[in-house]
Swiss-Prot record:
Cystine connections: C48-C63, C55-C72, C62-C88, C74-C86
Organism phylogeny: Eukaryota, Metazoa, Ecdysozoa, Arthropoda, Chelicerata
Annotated organism of origin: Lycosa singoriensis
Tissue spec. comment: Expressed by the venom gland.
Propeptide residue range(s): 23-44
Signal peptide start-end: 1-22
Location of this chain's protein in the cell: Secreted
Protein name, per record: U4-lycotoxin-Ls1d
Region (Linear cationic cytotoxin domain) location: 89-108
InterPro entries noted in UniProt: Spider_toxin_CSTX_knottin, Spider_toxin_CSTX_Knottin_CS
Location of region: Knottin domain: 45-88
Amino acid sequence: MKVLVLFSVLFLTLFSYSSTEAMDEFDSDAEEDMLSLMANEQVRAKACTPRLHDCSHDRHSCCRGELFKDVCYCFYPEGEDKTEVCSCQQPKSHKYIEKVVDKARTVVG
């Protein structure tokens, strides 16, 4: 019986040691993978299109305002030319919300 208890304790010790080694190896691999993904994302990031500039090449490339991202609006100008013109603009509702938030910040401190 003593041998069985001793063998069980030895087995549990070795098992816990091997599982912690495997977890440490897994954690280091996960950290390396996360760092490589972040580096790839930074390389892949592109420059945003400023407000009131042409966004017809990429309609999702508008820059962020203070609180909200600008939206690419497309329209057809008056006249004989029927080409579509797109520009990054701030929606009026976002403009009003930003004004209210600015006023609240000045009042609160």
